[in-house]
């Protein structure tokens, strides 16, 4: 089947199923192109909860579909590729986190949304890369346990006076970007600003003109008078950056910045999911209620 035919059939089935198609910023270009809404993981889940759709087709990875299920328990959540996981989310287990909590009794657990529903359920509050500093600094406690991303945790710690206990997790894709590669690119492109995600190694973040979430990158690059940018996050972000800023140049900091899990989902997978109404992601109610509490505490923190 031709790509255009597949897209037409996807649109037809979305209407027939009263479904909304969500695509994360790191998805393949053609998936972002056909999506009803693109964005970061939590933002997409929140948008989906607001819609009148009965079905959410989440083009992302497993923990993202779980978040959609947590916030929209009465909607059917489809994850076109059941095998689309997140290595960083898999690095932290409930058992391991409970052991860490036992070693630091009374210390609140701040959990990055890039984590499983089960881990969120034994956490005190969640955070995103966009609001992590604000979430941590909103807590009255002098110490925090931060899971699972040590790189984001260190980025936050530099902007907080609290003591941190880090889980030793990381994003393999962002970790592949090395400081020497960035330094060389910056030297070769002195007029370009280097923008990176705080999931990058601290040595890379130290070289950045600006470090922020994916949604922050769109905003920063749109408003900046600069015309050239070196981008230090997953390659999928380039699609929308170039679409929104046709007069600007975006250079991917490394060809290694490709997440294999984010690239699994194809148009054919989306069509199959809508045709068969599977695979469904549904978080068990006891875990859902506890995980939602941690998400709700984060959402309750006022935005700037």
Curated annotation (Swiss-Prot):
Compartments (UniProt record): Cytoplasm
Annotated keywords: 4Fe-4S, Cytoplasm, Iron, Iron-sulfur, Metal-binding, Pyridine nucleotide biosynthesis, Transferase
Catalytic activity of the protein: iminosuccinate + dihydroxyacetone phosphate = quinolinate + phosphate + 2 H2O + H(+)
GO annotation terms (biological process): 'de novo' NAD biosynthetic process from L-aspartate
MF annotations from Gene Ontology: 4 iron, 4 sulfur cluster binding; metal ion binding; quinolinate synthetase A activity
UniProt entry tagged with the keyword Transferase: yes
Bound cofactor: record note: Binds 1 [4Fe-4S] cluster per subunit.
Pathway(s) of this molecule: Cofactor biosynthesis; NAD(+) biosynthesis; quinolinate from iminoaspartate: step 1/1
Cofactor: [4Fe-4S] cluster
Enzyme Commission number(s) from the entry: 2.5.1.72
Enzyme class, UniProt record, top EC level: transferase
UniProt GO cellular component terms: cytosol
Binding-site list for [4Fe-4S] cluster: 86, 171, 259
UniProt entry tagged with the keyword Iron-sulfur: yes
Positions with a binding annotation for iminosuccinate: 24, 41, 112-114, 129, 197-199, 214
Cysteine-cysteine disulfides: none
Domain of life: Bacteria
Pfam families the UniProt entry points to: NadA
The protein's role, per its UniProt record: Catalyzes the condensation of iminoaspartate with dihydroxyacetone phosphate to form quinolinate.
PANTHER family: QUINOLINATE SYNTHASE, CHLOROPLASTIC (PTHR30573:SF0), QUINOLINATE SYNTHETASE A (PTHR30573)
NCBIfam families per record: nadA, PRK09375.1-2, PRK09375.1-4
HAMAP family noted in UniProt: NadA_type2
Family: Belongs to the quinolinate synthase family. Type 2 subfamily.
This protein's name: Quinolinate synthase
Organism: Geobacter metallireducens (strain ATCC 53774 / DSM 7210 / GS-15)
Upper classification of the organism: Bacteria, Pseudomonadati, Thermodesulfobacteriota, Desulfuromonadia, Geobacterales
